[in-house]
UniProtKB/Swiss-Prot annotation:
It catalyses: a hydroperoxide + [thioredoxin]-dithiol = an alcohol + [thioredoxin]-disulfide + H2O. Venom gland. It comes from Crotalus atrox (Western diamondback rattlesnake). It is found in: Secreted. One of its GO terms (cellular component) is endoplasmic reticulum. This is Peroxiredoxin-4. The keyword Lipid metabolism does not apply. GO terms for molecular function: thioredoxin peroxidase activity.
Length: 36
């Protein structure tokens, strides 16, 4: 599973097929960008 938790939201992916590392980094970078 994948959990991304910040001050504004919780993103959870508990599907049996996980996301790639590149997709996870893209999500984190997008969250960081919108926080600026």
């Amino acid at each position: 599973g994948l959990f991304i938790i910040d001050d504004k939201q919780i993103t959870m992916n508990d599907l049996p097929v996980g996301r790639s590392v590149d997709e996870t980094l893209r999500l984190v970078q997008a969250f960081q960008y919108t926080d600026k």
